[in-house]
Amino acid sequence: YFACGHQYFTPEAVHEILPYHDKERNIFFTADCILDNRPELMQELHITDADIPDGLLSYHAYLTWGERFVEHLLGAFSFAIYVPDADTFLLYTDHVGNRCINYSLQGQTLYFCTTYDLFKECFSSEQLKLSEKWITACESEPSACMLAFPGLTPFEEVFQLKAAHYIKYTNGKLSEIQYWKPQKCKKIHYREEEQYKDLVVQTFRKCVEDLLRPGTQIAANLSSGLDSTSIVSIAAPFLEKRGEILHTYTSIPDEAHDYESDAYFVPDESSAVKKTVACFPNIKSHFIDCKGENALTHLKKFVEEYDLPIKSAINLSWIYQVNHDAHARGCTIQLTGQMGNGTLSYGDILSLTYHQMRTFHLIQAKQSICDFLKKNHVPKKYFLHT
C-alpha cells in the first residue's frame, strides 16, 4: 500500500501525481523531492519536457541507471520503489539526510513513513516501545544535537534511514547500502589559492541559484552572521533580474525584555541586518519580536505538531511565526544558513581550531588562531585562557 500526502514547492510539482504506477513495467514509485541538478539531469536523460516534475524525472533516472540512480541526483529527496515481479522494495534518502524517512520491519511487512504517525496508528504500545538508548544519548548531550546514534529513533523498532543510504528488501532479507562517501570523493588540486576560492564561490552561487525556480515566492532567514548574509547576497540580485522580491525574516528581542550579556553577545541584530537589506532594493524585510511570548506560550500546539522531542524550544516561537508569515505570503521555499557553521563560516574559532587539531592539521590550526587574534585584536593570553 502506497500513499502520499502531496506537498509542492515548485511550479512543476503542482500537477504531479504521486504515487506513480508504471503499468507497463509494473513498478510502483513515490517521492518527496526537490532536485538541485535538474537541468543537467534532463540533458543526461535526453528529456525536453520543461514541465516534467522532479519526481517523474527521478523515476526516469531510475529506469536509466537502476538501483544506484541516486548517485546521479543532487538535492533533497526520499524515494520508495516497489517492484512486485522481482519481490524487491527500495527506500532512499539524500546525501545529507535533508529528507528524513523512517521504516520498521515487522515480520514480513515493511512499514515506511516520513513522519511517525503511521507507526503510532498501526503499532501496538508493545511494538512502539521508547528507546532508552536514544533518549539517554540526547539528554546527555549538552548541545541541541539529537543525532547521537545515526539510524536510531525514539522508538526501539523504528529506524531512520541514514544519510546517503538506501535499504533493499528482497526475498525476505533487508540490507542497508551506502551509496556516497564524501571521504572517497576525488580531490581537486590547483596550483593557486585563488583557483580554490573561485571554485568555492561558483559552487556556492550555483547551489543557491538552482533553488530559485521561476514562479516561486522565496523567503530567507536573515541574521547578521556570515552564513545567511552570504545566501541572501546571492539570492537577492538573482531574483532582482527576474523582477521578483525576496522576503527576509529576522528574529529580534522584545523591547520590554532586559538582556544581560557579555560584550561579545549581540541580542538585537537588526542594525546589521538593515545594512544588508539596504544593499538590495528588492528585499522586503520582516522583523519578528514574538512580543509577550516565550518557549512555553504555545507548548501544546508545538507538542502536537512536532514528531520528536526537541531541545531547542527557546527558538520555537520565532521559527513558528516566521514559517506562518512566509506561508501566508505564498512563499514555498525558505532559505536558511543552516549547516553554515560546518561549511561556510566554520562557526566559532574554538570549534574550528579544535577540529583542525583533531584531524592533525596543526599548521592550519596555528594559522587560524594567529589570523583571528590579529584581526580581532584579542590578546594571546586571553585566548589561551579561554
Give the role of each language-model region.
Residues Y1-D289, F302-E305:
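Cysteine-centered catalytic environments shared across enzyme families
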Residues C4, N26, Q106, F265, ...:
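Glycine-rich active-site loop/lid subdomains used to bind and stabilize high-energy intermediates
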